[in-house]
From Swiss-Prot:
Domain Ferritin-like diiron: 1-145
UniProt KW Oxidoreductase keyword: yes
Source lineage: Bacteria, Pseudomonadati, Pseudomonadota, Gammaproteobacteria, Enterobacterales
Effect of substituting residue 53 to A: Initially 6000-fold slower Fe(2+) oxidation rate
Subcellular location: Cytoplasm
Effect of residue 49 to A: Initially reduces Fe(2+)/O(2) stoichiometry from ~3 to ~2
Name used for this protein in its record: Bacterial non-heme ferritin
EC number: 1.16.3.2
């Protein structure tokens, strides 16, 4: 049985994953608007992936006999000055998610909630991959610079980049 503190924290994380999905969907819209179709497709796939992260938490809460609580989610930021700025923000967001997952895993361990700690290990591993993925995109954008040709090739690569890297 989950302690009330863990139920609250799992619900918070579930809602943060929902926000992540909406954020990446909004970023996808920005990319589409600015004709970065490869980046838009990549971010749409990533938005779907974040929704599966939310669903895993939702299912864990119900599987443990608890009620998931979906809260009102704030509108994600929608304006960026460049593709580089947008991906800098994705990286910062993934760092925030990593911090929150680590805090959640720590709370599970502190509360001797070993089943939840075990469940969260998938997220710990996933966040390592997420940060690595977005850091690699930022590095490529930095190498490409602001030239149209460089951005074109990065955008083209993003269209084929698997979110499960």
């Amino acid at each position: 049985m989950l302690k009330p503190e863990m139920i609250e924290k799992l619900n918070e994380q579930m809602n943060l994953e929902l926000y992540s999905s909406l954020l990446y969907q909004q970023m996808s819209a920005w990319c589409s608007y600015h004709t970065f179709e490869g980046a838009a497709a990549f971010l749409r796939r990533h938005a779907q992936e974040e929704m599966t992260h939310m669903q895993r938490l939702f299912d864990y809460l119900t599987d443990t006999g608890n009620l998931p609580r979906i809260n009102t989610v704030e509108s994600p930021f929608a304006e960026y000055s460049s593709l580089d700025e947008l991906f800098q923000e994705t990286y910062k967001h993934e760092q925030l998610i990593t911090q929150k997952i680590n805090e959640l895993a720590h709370a599970a361990m502190t509360n001797q909630d070993y089943p939840t700690f075990n469940f969260l290990q998938w997220y710990v591993s996933e966040q390592h991959e997420e940060e690595k993925l977005f850091k690699s995109i930022i590095d490529k954008l930095s190498l490409a610079g602001k030239s149209g040709e460089g951005l074109y090739f990065i955008d083209k690569e993003l269209s084929t980049l698997d979110t499960q890297n």
